[in-house]
Amino acid sequence: MVSWKGIYFVVALFLGSFFGSIFMLGPFLPLMFISPAWYRWITDRIVATWLTLPVALLEMVFGAKVVVTGDGFIPGERSVIIMNHRTRMDWMFLWNCLLRYSYLRLEKICLKSSLKSIPGFGWAMQVAAFIFIQRKWEDDKSHFENMLHYFCDIHEPLQLLIFPEGTDLTANTKARSNDFAEKNGLRKYEYVLHPRTTGFTFVVECLREGNNLDAIHDITVAYPQNIPQTEKHLLNGNFPKEIHFHVQRYPIETVPTSKEELQLWCQKRWEEKEERLRRFYEGGKCFDETGQSIIPPCKSELRVLAVKCISLLYWTVFPMGTFALLYLYSFARWYFAAMIIIFVAQQKIFGGLELIELACHQYFKKQQKHDDTKMKKK
């Protein structure tokens, strides 16, 4: 049954992303045609302000507790984050961890392409340059390569979240994973799915070659009580009471360089996850005996609390302010309508704002190369 908590959560996130895309991100869209690097720098920080809202709602309104154990992050470092995909919402819950131990503005997520069509959420994800995939490697490889080369070219640090399992853990996906294991003589898993290593190895190789990778963060996520498997569970008010993250940091120098060894390395991490999660769910429902966060965060809890309070206040007032603006001023209504048309039309015509941004960067890069060639001839 749909609950008021779920409705409040979804409506608050939607209004924030919808009006934020139009009134906060929209004015900066022309900047991508002048300087894609500056456009990326500014919009990453604007999007990060919205990413604090789900964190604030989950913890301050719905009382979710976050526990982080393991190695933690070095603030500002460039990394690939690999995580088990227990629910469809793991990527959002990870923001509760990153707010404390890293910087939300650095995160990019690899997501299925259908999500970019969602008004508000999808528009903001396009502006944030998330990597949208079709889940067909022959179609995704060139897009992956172009986006990763872009991030390397502009020297903007990123922490790229990918789910090697490819989908969340359900009875159906576990059955398919077990069929795969049986055909290939592998162990059947109970708490994770067998990882698909092709995309992972490609991402690591690309970022490594572009000198844009400091470490790999292997994160195991678990929910000791209620598990919100889908968006419907959140709408029904089934929010996680506790979210546990166990972080293992591997400096890139310690990670294998060959493709075959990297595949085995990833598979080994999943074997460890299976055992770690087995101990978690069959034992004391914690990754560490204390059941408490043991990693010193890069931000104090007082600072995190201040960020959450400001976020909750701002994203409550902001939609009301935009409603008032639209009611009082005709130019705001014209701008509002124009931006909706632009967001919808550009995706129909060009496929997404991240592709336009990428094309602009490639154009400027080509022009720079042409100018450099002319200078050398002189």
From Swiss-Prot:
Q: Which SMART domains match?
A: PlsC
Per the annotation, which location comes first and is thus the protein's main one? endoplasmic reticulum
Q: Where is this motif: HXXXXD motif?
A: 85-90
Alphabetized InterPro entries for the sequence: Acyltransf_C, Plipid/glycerol_acylTrfase
For membrane topology, the record states: Multi-pass membrane protein
Please state where this protein is localized: Endoplasmic reticulum membrane
| GO molecular function terms attached to this record | 1-acylglycerol-3-phosphate O-acyltransferase activity; acyltransferase activity
> Which keywords are on file for this protein?
Acyltransferase, Developmental protein, Endoplasmic reticulum, Lipid biosynthesis, Lipid metabolism, Membrane, Phospholipid biosynthesis, Phospholipid metabolism, Transferase, Transmembrane, Transmembrane helix
Q: Which CDD domains would you find in this protein's record? A: LPLAT_LCLAT1-like (cd07990)
Kindly tell me the pathway this chain contributes to: Phospholipid metabolism; CDP-diacylglycerol biosynthesis; CDP-diacylglycerol from sn-glycerol 3-phosphate: step 2/3
Q: What class of enzyme is it?
A: transferase
Residues annotated as transmembrane: 9-29, 46-66, 302-322, 336-358
Does this entry carry the keyword Heme?
no
**Catalyses which reaction?**
a 1-acyl-sn-glycero-3-phosphate + an acyl-CoA = a 1,2-diacyl-sn-glycero-3-phosphate + CoA; a 1-acyl-sn-glycero-3-phospho-(1D-myo-inositol) + an acyl-CoA = a 1,2-diacyl-sn-glycero-3-phospho-(1D-myo-inositol) + CoA; 1-acyl-sn-glycero-3-phospho-(1'-sn-glycerol) + an acyl-CoA = a 1,2-diacyl-sn-glycero-3-phospho-(1'-sn-glycerol) + CoA; 1-hexadecanoyl-sn-glycero-3-phosphate + (9Z)-octadecenoyl-CoA = 1-hexadecanoyl-2-(9Z-octadecenoyl)-sn-glycero-3-phosphate + CoA
GO terms for CC?
endomembrane system; endoplasmic reticulum; endoplasmic reticulum membrane
Which Pfam families does the record cross-reference, listed alphabetically?
Answer: Acyltransf_C (PF16076), Acyltransferase (PF01553)
Q: Could you say which EC number(s) this protein's record lists?
A: 2.3.1.-, 2.3.1.51
Instruction: Supply one GO BP term.
Output: phosphatidylinositol acyl-chain remodeling
Got any disulfides in this one, which pairs?
none
Q: Which PANTHER family match?
A: 1-ACYLGLYCEROL-3-PHOSPHATE ACYLTRANSFERASE-RELATED, LYSOCARDIOLIPIN ACYLTRANSFERASE 1
State the domain notes: The HXXXXD motif is essential for acyltransferase activity and may constitute the binding site for the phosphate moiety of the glycerol-3-phosphate.
According to its UniProt entry, what is the function of this protein? Exhibits acyl-CoA:lysocardiolipin acyltransferase (ALCAT) activity; catalyzes the reacylation of lyso-cardiolipin to cardiolipin (CL), a key step in CL remodeling. Recognizes both monolysocardiolipin and dilysocardiolipin as substrates with a preference for linoleoyl-CoA and oleoyl-CoA as acyl donors.
Concerning its family, UniProt says:
Belongs to the 1-acyl-sn-glycerol-3-phosphate acyltransferase family.
Q: What is this protein called?
A: Lysocardiolipin acyltransferase 1
Instruction: Please tell me the species this chain comes from.
Output: Gallus gallus
Classification lineage: Eukaryota, Metazoa, Chordata, Craniata, Vertebrata
